[in-house]
Amino acid sequence: GSPKYCHLPADPGPC
């Protein structure tokens, strides 16, 4: 996942 898109379930980031 990308930190920029960590709010998206499809790309969970280190949030």
From Swiss-Prot:
Residues in BPTI/Kunitz inhibitor domain copies:
6-15
Q: Kindly list the places in or outside the cell where this protein is found, as annotated in its UniProt entry.
A: Secreted
Return the GO cellular component terms, semicolon-separated. extracellular region
Tell me which species this is from.
Micrurus altirostris
What name goes with this protein? Protease inhibitor
Does the record carry Disulfide bond as a key word?
A: yes
Q: What does this protein do?
A: Snake venom serine protease inhibitor.
Please indicate which superkingdom the organism of origin belongs to.
Answer: Eukaryota
Provide any one GO MF term from the record: toxin activity
Distribution of this protein across tissues and organs: Expressed by the venom gland.
Record bears the keyword Secreted: yes
* Family classification: Belongs to the venom Kunitz-type family.
Kindly state which keywords UniProt assigns to this record, in alphabetical order. Disulfide bond, Protease inhibitor, Secreted, Serine protease inhibitor, Toxin
